[in-house]
């Protein structure tokens, strides 16, 4: 159920401007695309994004450019007094309605002290659950391909704050494109590399 709510929340902005999907259709889209979303999350989380390290920001910019460009977005680098912003624009393939959906994401993260993470690498997605002693125990992430427990959690640096929302958007976008349900509106995404 949480997968459906999560996926539905991400699809909501698209659905405001496009054809409505019922619960059965949302369930189907979730089943078809959640694994691709998890794979993308693992790929994106694996790239360090410490805002204080210039090379991390450059790598994050390249990663975001690739992720959006591969989906048909045109990217523009917006220079600022500091770190540039990226503006990703998707022009609808259908007849343009005249409206634009504008979204904002930040892709940077805070410094990380690996010794304070209870896993080998903070930039690796790890599946965990609470043990009887209330400690987090690591599970085989492949369990997600065959089962689901609402008490499981994914751990990885910037998973819930910076990178997770971007992956949710891209996964929802992919799902709607695959079903030919994408909005007839222009979509603009501001990606802040140093919030």
Enumerate the language-model features and the residues they cover:
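Bacterial Sec-dependent N-terminal signal peptides
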Residues: 1-20
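Residue-level micro-sites within transmembrane alpha helices that shape
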Residues: 2, 160-162
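Acidic/His- and Gly-rich active-site-bordering loop/insert found
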Residues: 20-159, 166, 176-186
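Acidic, glycine-rich active-site loops and adjacent beta-strand->loop/helix elements
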Residues: 107-109, 190-195
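Carbohydrate-associated surface elements
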Residues: 169
